[in-house]
A protein has these predicted regions:
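Nuclease catalytic cores that cleave nucleic-acid phosphodiester bonds
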Residues: 92-241
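Domain-level signal for Mg2+-assisted phosphodiester chemistry and nucleotide/NA-binding surfaces
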Residues: 1-121, 128-138, 145, 183-189, ...
């Protein structure tokens, strides 16, 4: 078995939990791929046990891509191209499904009408004013990302490509590939954002070790629009996500 370690980064998890931990609105959070590699290569070996004699192989970066006809696809492709040029990163893309829903709109409008009644003001006028200042955006959900993580982790573990896997994710569905990698003789460390509250219980129980990304490293990984930096110094394209 190779004396190497790999990172498996679920970008959806890092974006959601990282933006919350850093106090950045989710829609404004930009992920810095080069900072993630820095953490894996420089910080992690001093943070967790068992890295003596191990070399960093690469980080697999899992995200969802919009459909080619989507208005935001061109800009997203530009970002992905930059990430793909980041040294030490291999980009792996699932799909980003988008759907319009009134799942939140109805209960919010009902709450506003109740509040209007308590305040003695017109409910219709309040709701109409709110809708003039608020845009109901479609919900987005990653598809196929967990499958890609599963396939890569199992394939690489069974081929002996790595000794240790560092999984930055929290989904319960990833418990099975973790178990399979361990059965192949590999060690699996699960890295969390915000502690085990963001981690599925089964994943936490299976992990050989659970660690939390330090706040200073996290702040470099997840930046706001005014604090962003190039995701890596060798590529001409920006890689913030």
């Amino acid at each position: 078995m190779g004396r190497a370690y790999c990172g498996f980064i679920d970008v959806g998890y890092l974006r959601a939990q990282g933006s919350r931990a850093c106090g950045i609105p989710g829609g404004q959070a930009q992920l810095q791929a080069s900072a993630c590699v820095d953490w894996l290569q420089i910080v992690l070996p001093h943070q967790a046990a068992g890295f003596a004699g191990l070399s960093f192989l690469r980080a697999y970066w899992y995200d969802g891509a919009l459909e080619p006809h989507h208005a935001g696809s061109s800009e997203q492709r530009h970002v992905f191209d930059g990430i793909a040029f980041t040294p030490g990163v291999q980009l792996r893309l699932g799909h980003l499904a988008e759907r319009r829903t009134n799942r939140l709109q109805r209960p919010i409008e009902q709450a506003m009408r109740s509040a209007a009644g308590d305040l003695g003001i017109g409910a219709d006028e309040l709701v109409a004013a709110f809708n003039r200042h608020w845009t109901w955006r479609p919900e987005r959900q990653q598809k196929g990302v967990d499958t890609l993580i599963t396939l890569d982790m199992v394939r690489l573990a069974q081929s002996g490509a790595f000794h240790t896997a560092v999984l930055l994710a929290g989904d319960r569905d990833l418990a099975e590939p973790v178990r399979t990698a361990q059965d192949a003789g590999c060690r699996v460390i699960v890295a969390t954002v915000g502690g085990q509250a963001s981690l599925a219980k089964e994943l936490a129980q299976l992990a050989d070790e659970v660690i939390e990304i330090p706040q200073d490293s996290l702040a470099a990984m997840v930046t706001g629009p005014t604090r962003s930096r190039p995701a890596q110094s060798r590529a001409a394209e920006p890689t913030e996500q």
